[in-house]
């Protein structure tokens, strides 16, 4: 919702009746309106259905089957509003053996294979906070799908369901690595590839004051500038792309 609201959409959050409003403290709630509804009551269900009748889209994040049991599933709401784009966000997808399982970002990026690529050589994988599953593979993928669905509905008059699973999104985020592996340009070991800290010109280094600096000098002109500024005059640094020399450099 934050991404859509930030780009000008009118976003209304349907909150549980009596719940605390975190909009003033939660950055993810910015630019969103808020209403309360008791989804266990006929009145609450009717209120949501009425709201959806004039909406471009709706987003829900319950476990699979919950919205259907509430009487707010896609068949019902698209019956009320055929142009509605119905967004669904789950960890594992609507179907399959894990669809009803609980999970967090770390679980989704593990199953997708994404987590395998993060970390130093000969060490365990290091989760990159919850940026990959929850936000990149989840929220951003769904917001893109919602925009695409709404644009399609405006030209065709037909709504649709956007089924977004964080596991699927996390796998897509790593598409470049999967492609490189298929081409033989990426090794299936952490910390031995150019973009995962193996290369001396693409890594982080501790400074004298205890802070850290990131270096990303892939292109020849930037690598030459790095050598000039860092005083790397040893001829050994000439062979920038010689992977066999990276560990010693």
Residue ranges, per PLM feature:
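N-terminal helix-loop segment corresponding to the beta1-alpha1 unit
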Residues: 1-155
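Short acidic/polar mixed-charge low-complexity motifs
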Residues: 33, 158, 209-211
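Conserved beta-loop-beta element that borders a ligand/cofactor-binding pocket
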Residues: 88-90, 160-165
């Amino acid at each position: 919702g934050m991404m859509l609201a930030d780009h000008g959409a009118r976003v209304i959050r349907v909150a549980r009746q009596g719940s605390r409003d975190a909009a003033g403290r939660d950055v993810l709630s910015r630019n969103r309106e808020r209403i309360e509804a008791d989804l266990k009551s006929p009145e609450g269900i009717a209120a949501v259905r009425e709201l959806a009748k004039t909406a471009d889209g709706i987003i829900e994040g319950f476990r699979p089957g919950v919205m259907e049991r509430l009487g707010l599933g896609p068949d019902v709401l698209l019956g009320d509003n055929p142009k509605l784009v119905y967004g669904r966000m789950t960890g594992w997808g609507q179907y399959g053996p894990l669809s009803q399982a609980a999970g967090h970002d770390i679980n989704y990026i593990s199953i997708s294979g994404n987590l395998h690529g993060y970390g130093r050589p000969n060490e365990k994988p290091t989760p990159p906070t919850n940026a990959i599953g929850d936000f990149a593979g989840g929220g951003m993928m769904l917001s893109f799908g919602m925009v695409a669905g709404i644009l399609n509905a405006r030209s065709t008059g037909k709504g649709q369901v956007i089924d977004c699973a964080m596991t699927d999104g996390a796998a897509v985020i790593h598409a470049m690595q999967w492609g490189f592996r298929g081409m033989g340009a990426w090794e299936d070991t952490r910390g031995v590839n150019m973009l995962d800290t193996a290369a001396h010109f693409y890594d982080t280094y501790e400074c004298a004051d205890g802070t850290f600096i990131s270096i990303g000098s892939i292109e020849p002109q930037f690598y030459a500038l790095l050598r000039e500024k860092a005083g790397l005059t040893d001829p050994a640094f000439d062979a920038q792309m010689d992977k066999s020399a990276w560990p010693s450099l």
